[in-house]
């Protein structure tokens, strides 16, 4: 095993926090190894004036990092799983998926303290078509406006740009220590109201398939239950050929030997939401079955229409 491992990470505070957390976990098992983070700027980081759904494409936050991995500039990379395309670059694999943080979305309110207290016509900040579609299904009176930037920037914009509320991933707030901030008015959004993104709350540690020593090292922090649930979600995403320009959601839970998976596809304004769920022993099988059911209900038409806009 090499004495020094180079870890690829995006430059954002959240990405660096996540990478340092992974290094800390690996250090517990491999105290003799030194780790160094190499910061990499991605296309998604550079484009801040356009919503990601309009940029389109896949891998907006991972392509440059994957290239560095393929070029052997880095030894492994730490990603937010929800940013990782369902098909990886040739020669690369997910070496480990650590235990998942909360998969939920979270309201951060400006003045009120609960969703029910938001007035008619409230302005909600999110650039996620998935969040917008599900929220508008529940409250079509809401005005959804895009908001970009890191967590700190979005929290500043909540007040500076007079949003009534913004929606963030609870996992990001947790990792950055914001859940302990008593000045924030937070409310979890249940999966019944807003089904999470595929892989939300989980990390993906990507490495070269041929680098067996790195693969073995990463396996020491893999969390089996999280890996099984994420497998169902990603099989579903791959079958639908989903990306950030489509309101797609998928969330799996494991109880005993069985996995429960629910998937969703909708149009941009939430007027059409297709949902299906399955329980079974094989995560890949139920993820595929739910995707097939949604396709048979017309999900392919919704996806084609959104891609042609």
Curated annotation (Swiss-Prot):
GO cellular component, one term: cytoplasm
NCBIfam families, alphabetized: hemC
Protein name, as recorded: Porphobilinogen deaminase
GO MF term set: hydroxymethylbilane synthase activity
Cofactor note: Binds 1 dipyrromethane group covalently.
Residues with S-(dipyrrolylmethanemethyl)cysteine modification: 244
Organism this protein belongs to: Listeria innocua serovar 6a (strain ATCC BAA-680 / CLIP 11262)
Catalytic reactions on record: 4 porphobilinogen + H2O = hydroxymethylbilane + 4 NH4(+)
Oxidoreductase recorded as keyword: no
Similarity remark: Belongs to the HMBS family.
Top-level class of the enzyme under EC nomenclature: transferase
Subunit description: Monomer.
Keywords: Porphyrin biosynthesis, Transferase
């Amino acid at each position: 095993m090499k004495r020094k491992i180079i870890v690829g990470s995006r430059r954002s505070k959240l990405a660096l926090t996540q990478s340092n957390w992974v290094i800390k976990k690996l250090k517990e098992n491999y105290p003799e190894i030194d780790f160094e983070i190499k910061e990499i700027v991605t296309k998604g980081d550079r484009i801040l004036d356009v919503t990601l759904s309009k940029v389109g494409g896949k891998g907006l936050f991972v392509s440059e990092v994957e290239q560095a991995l393929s070029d052997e500039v880095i030894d492994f990379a730490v990603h937010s799983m929800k940013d990782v395309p369902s098909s990886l670059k040739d020669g690369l694999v997910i070496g480990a998926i650590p235990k998942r943080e909360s998969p939920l979305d979270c309201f951060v309110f400006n003045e009120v303290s609960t969703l029910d207290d938001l007035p008619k016509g409230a302005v909600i900040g999110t650039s996620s078509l998935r969040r917008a579609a599900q929220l508008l299904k529940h409250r079509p009176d809401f005005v959804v406006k895009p908001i970009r930037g890191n967590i700190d920037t979005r929290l500043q914009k909540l007040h500076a740009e007079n949003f009534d509320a913004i929606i963030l991933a609870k996992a990001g707030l947790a990792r950055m220590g914001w859940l302990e901030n008593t000045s924030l008015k937070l409310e979890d959004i249940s999966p019944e109201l807003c089904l999470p993104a595929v892989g939300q709350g989980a990390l993906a540690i990507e490495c070269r398939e041929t680098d067996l020593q790195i693969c073995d090292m990463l396996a020491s922090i893999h969390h089996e239950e999280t890996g099984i649930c994420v497998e169902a979600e990603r099989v579903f995403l791959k079958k639908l050929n989903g990306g950030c320009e489509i309101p797609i959601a998928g969330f799996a839970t494991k109880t005993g030997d069985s996995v429960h998976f629910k998937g969703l596809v909708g149009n941009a304004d939430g007027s059409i939401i297709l949902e299906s769920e399955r329980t079974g022993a094989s995560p890949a099988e139920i993820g595929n079955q739910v995707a097939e059911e949604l396709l048979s209900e017309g999900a392919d038409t919704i996806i084609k229409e959104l891609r042609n806009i």
